[in-house]
A protein has these predicted regions:
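A short secondary-structure junction motif
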Residues: 5-16, 43-59, 91-92, 172-198, ...
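Conserved aromatic-histidine-acidic binding/catalytic patches
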Residues: 15, 32, 36, 40, ...
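Conserved glycosyltransferase catalytic-site signature
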Residues: 2, 6-8, 21-24, 42-46, ...
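Long, positively charged binding patches that form subdomain-scale interaction surfaces
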Residues: 165-245
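Non-catalytic, alpha-helical, charged scaffold/linker segments
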Residues: 65-195
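Extended charged low-complexity segments that act as oligomerization/scaffolding linkers
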Residues: 15, 22-107, 284, 288, ...
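Metal-dependent nucleic-acid phosphoesterase active-site entry motif
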Residues: 1-19, 152-163, 169, 215-223
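Long, positively charged, glycine-interspersed low-complexity recognition regions
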Residues: 53, 219-299
């Protein structure tokens, strides 16, 4: 859908659907007026890195123009903060105040690891400005760099393909597979849970995984992650290399954003795995549908 937005700016003839073109124009106008936030994330950096030449330049320019400095925090950082909140409550340990906004203008918000600030004799105000300029210049450079970067194929997806094919797993009930999906999600992030516990001074016990599993409903992003895994496993979906990026970033966005636009496949499994929550699933597959939802929220 970013390509639709980009084409609506740089080559309108490539947007064949009139409704898509109109929706793109409305969304861009709202974003530039500050009425809606359309953030950039590190997933966009990964996706644009596979492109090159004019196509990449146009797409990157569109992302930078519409996002206006807004970023979605790294899903890894979001779920670590969710786990900190749970552990702080369970062990009655006060957590240090932290910036919790998932969508932020803070320098380096979309990074998984905090940038190491170089030693400087600059006054605090100027040092802060320098840090912000460096952070946003980095986003610009990464997105606009015309060099094509080959995608790295991780083995994460094959683990779940193997689980789906396992006869013992296939014999389990749908309910048990959903439970297993959440358990696998907690297992995936357990090292992050350990880091969260250590940062709070909480003893790392064998029951850490059980504590996180029992409280998964109170962790929006991790809950979506677990429920999507369970849904796809019980439906024997084929796992592709890019699924990890989609589930991490779209799942995190779905947990916190008002409206999320995704490709049809991701929209389908996010909607079907949503289950009973306080609000309906915000994920849609078509840009006009997203604009319709936003229009209702803005009225």
């Amino acid at each position: 859908h970013w390509s639709t937005l980009s084409n609506s700016i740089f080559d309108r003839t490539r947007v064949r659907d009139k409704e898509d073109l109109e929706a793109a124009g409305r969304l861009i106008a709202w974003a530039e007026a500050g009425r809606v936030i359309v953030p950039v994330s590190s997933a966009h950096a990964l996706e644009t890195s596979a492109l090159y030449n004019e196509r990449r330049q146009n797409l990157a320019a569109t992302i930078l123009r519409i996002s206006r400095g807004w970023q979605m925090r790294s899903p890894v950082m979001v779920r670590m903060r969710e786990m900190k909140g749970v552990l702080s409550d369970v062990y009655s340990v006060p957590a240090a105040p932290d910036e919790l906004d998932v969508f932020s203008l803070a320098a380096g918000a979309m990074d998984t690891k905090r940038r190491v600030a170089s030693a400087s004799d600059l006054p605090p105000g100027l040092a802060k400005l320098t840090n912000r300029l460096t952070a946003f210049s980095t986003i610009y450079d990464v997105l606009m760099n015309p060099e094509r970067v080959p995608s790295v194929v991780a083995g994460w997806h094959e683990h779940f393909n193997n689980v789906s094919r396992d006869p013992e797993f296939r014999a389990r009930s749908s309910k048990q597979k959903s439970i297993d999906g959440r358990a696998m999600a907690v297992s995936d992030v357990l090292q992050e849970g350990v880091a969260a516990a250590l940062s709070l001074g909480v003893p790392v016990e064998e029951r850490l995984a059980s504590v996180l599993y029992a409280r998964i409903d109170s962790m929006p992003s991790l809950r979506v992650y677990g429920d999507v895994i369970g849904h796809r496993l019980k439906n024997r979906a084929k796992w592709e290399p890019n699924d990890l990026i989609d589930i991490l970033f779209l799942g995190c966005a779905a947990a916190y954003a008002d409206v999320v636009v995704a490709e049809r496949t991701a929209t389908d499994y996010l909607q079907r795995s949503w289950g009973s929550r306080d609000r309906s699933c915000p994920v849609v597959a078509k840009l006009p549908e997203a604009v319709g939802k936003l229009s209702h929220l803005l009225d």
